[in-house]
């Protein structure tokens, strides 16, 4: 049974305002979603926080999120807290997210980690459409469970898909399936004793592979690597035994990117 009477929806559309900074052009949301007004931590980079006024996702919860980042906008989107997926019993919780990043626009999508509780089943599907001049940082951090309770890999199933298109041509696809019933997630080809996993994609970002590699090597408690995709963009995969090392690594990379992206002419 869905916690809410209908599918939870969030719509956000941005544009460049009179002062030359990214502002909200239009928005709409249903419970539990809310949006904070944008603030500007640096130059013309806007930051908007997505809020979910709920204890987490339950069985039957379905979220439909659509984000349209207007041309020339520079925006960072964050979440309010760690996302919890509760025991979904014999069902599942799901999220479909569609993101459009306009010409010469920059989006840094940086949510907090996702924590699947015991017997949680979650399905996530994200599609991102870019123009050739769009810039993107997109990440997800997945936790093995409630680590402090030693509840590791007790969830039912977690399946997330990320599809990125540039001028309608596919340039990146990630299909993550974590199923403790069929796979030993602690084996050396999976988590290998770690409990937190970062997946970060960088498209058209002003940072070299060597710079990202240096960030990883300097990050204490992180085991990770960066690779170049066939379309010459970057993908980072990293493991750690806590959220903080991965959040710090992600922030370090994002800071290097935005130092260039937000420079005013």
From Swiss-Prot:
Q: What does this protein do?
A: Required for maturation of urease via the functional incorporation of the urease nickel metallocenter.
Q: Which keywords are on file for this protein?
A: Chaperone, Cytoplasm, Nickel insertion, Virulence
Description of the deletion phenotype: Cells do not express urease.
Just give the chief location class.
Answer: cytoplasm
Which family, according to the similarity comment?
Belongs to the UreD family.
Per its record, how is this protein called by name? Urease accessory protein UreH
Identify one Pfam family in the record.
UreD
Query: Its GO CC terms?
Result: cytoplasm
Organism annotation: Helicobacter pylori (strain ATCC 700392 / 26695) (Campylobacter pylori)
Q: Could you tell me which HAMAP family the record lists for this protein?
A: UreD
- Source organism superkingdom: Bacteria
């Amino acid at each position: 049974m869905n916690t809410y009477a209908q599918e939870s929806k969030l719509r956000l559309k941005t544009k460049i305002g009179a002062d030359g900074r990214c502002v909200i052009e239009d928005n709409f949301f249903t419970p539990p979603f809310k949006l904070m007004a944008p603030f500007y931590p640096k130059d013309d980079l806007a930051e908007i926080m997505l809020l979910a006024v709920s204890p987490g996702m339950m069985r039957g919860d379905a979220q439909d999120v659509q984000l349209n980042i207007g041309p020339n906008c520079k925006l960072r989107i964050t979440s309010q807290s760690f996302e919890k997926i509760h025991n979904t019993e014999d069902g599942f919780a799901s999220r479909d997210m569609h993101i459009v990043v306009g010409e010469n626009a920059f989006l840094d999508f940086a949510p907090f980690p996702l924590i699947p509780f015991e017997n949680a089943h979650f399905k996530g599907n994200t599609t991102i459409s870019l123009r050739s001049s769009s810039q993107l940082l997109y990440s997800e951090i997945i936790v093995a469970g409630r680590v402090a309770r030693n509840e590791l890999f007790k969830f039912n199933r977690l399946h997330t898909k990320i599809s990125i298109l540039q001028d309608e041509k596919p340039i990146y696809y990630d299909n993550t399936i974590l199923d403790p019933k069929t796979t030993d997630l602690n084996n050396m080809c999976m988590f290998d004793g770690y409990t937190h996993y970062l997946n970060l994609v960088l498209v058209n970002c002003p940072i070299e592979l060597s710079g990202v590699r240096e960030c990883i090597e300097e990050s204490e408690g992180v085991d990770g690597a960066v690779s170049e995709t066939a379309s010459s963009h970057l993908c980072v995969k990293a493991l750690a035994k806590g959220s903080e090392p991965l959040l710090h690594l992600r922030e370090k990379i994002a800071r290097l990117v935005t130092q260039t992206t937000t420079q005013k002419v």
